[in-house]
Amino acid sequence: MPRPDRISSATLDYLRNELKPLVGTQFRILSLPVKALQAFEPSQVGTIVGTLMDACIPHLEGIPQVGLKKHEGILGDREGYPDYKHSSGLRVELKLLYIDNPTLEMKRPPTRREPSARLTQKVTVKNVNPATDAMLLIAYRLEPQAENPSLVSPTIFDFEVFSMIELVEARDRRLLACGGRWFGDYETPTILSRVGKAKLKAGLALDDTSYGRKESEGKDYNEDTNFGKLQRIPHAGLKAFLNKNREFLEVSEATNGQADPTA
């Protein structure tokens, strides 16, 4: 039974329909020569273009029919949450997913890398409004410009919207299921270090008074540098969207060789 204090599937359907005009949008302000792509790996281009896309996202406001306006944010200017406010009053956090375009000639390595898109620790149960907040996940790829095929630009070809509170809860459940924990009031997510795992296996008490940033510090917990990667969040809807394009995602180095207990 739907919870009245949470964004409903009907509301997400409404938002999804409102945002449909985004599909096909091409950011020609970012133009790359097709020939230059041959020297780059997809992951390298994704990093470069993704950074530039973040800077150009305010241009989405130039599509009035979708009703998105930049939100003032509640966490400061650069890292403000959420990114947008919809004309309906819904709040939208934007995430970008780079998809490799197999029709473009690039330097493709034999080993793929895990997508870097993530739901970071800046978004927690403390600042998410369960009734109004959604995540907009935009899948984009480089496509030739119609007027000048020798140039390619990032182009939105698919998107999905999700309940933000559901994603945050799924992300945090995975952290705990893997033996991790939060330090502070949802400030720093940590995972067991090699020392911590050894102590746990030996039945010894863990020291949860501090954490480290690297193994050499000898702490029982280390900061989780992979926290919130979308590929690792056990949410059925999110996984279904990622699976649609799995063939062209950078999907290796999954869980540092460990099974995901929540998968």
Placement of each model-derived feature along the sequence:
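Nucleic-acid endonuclease domains
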Residues: 1-82, 96-263
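Active-site beta-strand-loop-beta-strand hairpin of nuclease catalytic cores
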Residues: 82-94
